[in-house]
């Protein structure tokens, strides 16, 4: 039930479903999750169940979710995960080719599956997310849980963003909890937001000047584990 509910919460939030709709969707998804040994293609199985339901409301959910569920992304694997091949290799999942209307939902579902699988299997992994500004990081989201809880389960994360302007205050709070922050030269419109994340108020004006003076390829690094140069001047030393 927890797996079905977690998946349906993400789908429901991204599609603005109400509690009753999420409950109906969860009931259908729970059946598929319980039968995933014989229904390995999870999304098509969910879509078929929704569209063949005796309930008109459930069939309506199937029609609304067909653009998402017609993509056979999740597949039952021998190691217990649905989409993540747990192995000592790098695996790249590119969702840019999917329609804009389902891209965020699909990315969050993948993150949820990886987080759940890695936590259950107790295998350390690192999840790198590019263009993270396109995803939700607020309280209760899967990416927020990866940031705030991941280290307890040996799950690391590397988050890459072109901008901080799109993040809400609670999302910036989540980002501030990351162990290491690395800022390359930002545009002038981003300098204040970067300085607020890098420095306490009493040191913020100095940080603004440092950010303005950065050259291409230089960056400011804030970390509990690495110290390069001094606190007043940027360093051109390579990060090993």
Model-identified regions with their sequence ranges:
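Conserved beta-strand edge residues that scaffold enzyme active sites
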Residues: 164-165
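P-loop NTPase motor domains
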Residues: 1-155, 159, 168-171, 202-203, ...
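P-loop NTPase motor core of the ASCE superfamily
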Residues: 20, 170-240
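Short hydrophobic alpha-helical runs that function as membrane-insertion/retention elements
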Residues: 156-161, 181-185
């Amino acid at each position: 039930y927890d797996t079905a509910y977690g998946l349906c919460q993400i789908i429901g939030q991204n599609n603005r479903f109400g509690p009753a709709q999420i409950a109906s969707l969860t009931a259908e998804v729970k059946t598929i999750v319980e039968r995933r040994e014989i229904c390995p293609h999870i999304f098509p199985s969910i879509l078929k169940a929704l569209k063949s339901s005796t309930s008109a409301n459930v069939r309506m959910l199937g029609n609304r979710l067909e653009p998402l569920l017609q993509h056979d992304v999740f597949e039952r694997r021998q190691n217990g995960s649905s989409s993540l091949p747990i192995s000592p290799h790098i695996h790249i999942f590119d969702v840019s080719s999917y329609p804009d209307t389902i891209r965020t939902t699909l990315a969050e579902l993948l993150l949820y599956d990886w987080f759940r699988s890695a936590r259950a299997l107790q295998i350390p992994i690192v999840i790198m997310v590019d263009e993270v500004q396109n995803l939700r990081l607020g309280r209760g989201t899967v990416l927020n849980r990866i940031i705030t809880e991941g280290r307890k389960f040996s799950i690391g994360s590397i988050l890459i963003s072109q901008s901080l302007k799109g993040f809400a205050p609670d999302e910036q709070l989540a980002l501030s909890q990351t162990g290491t922050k690395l800022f390359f030269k930002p545009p002038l419109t981003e300098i204040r937001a970067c300085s607020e994340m890098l420095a306490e108020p009493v040191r913020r004006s100095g940080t603004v000047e440092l950010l303005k003076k950065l050259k291409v390829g230089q960056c400011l690094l804030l970390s509990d584990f690495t110290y390069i140069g001094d606190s007043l001047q940027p360093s051109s030393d390579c990060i090993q």
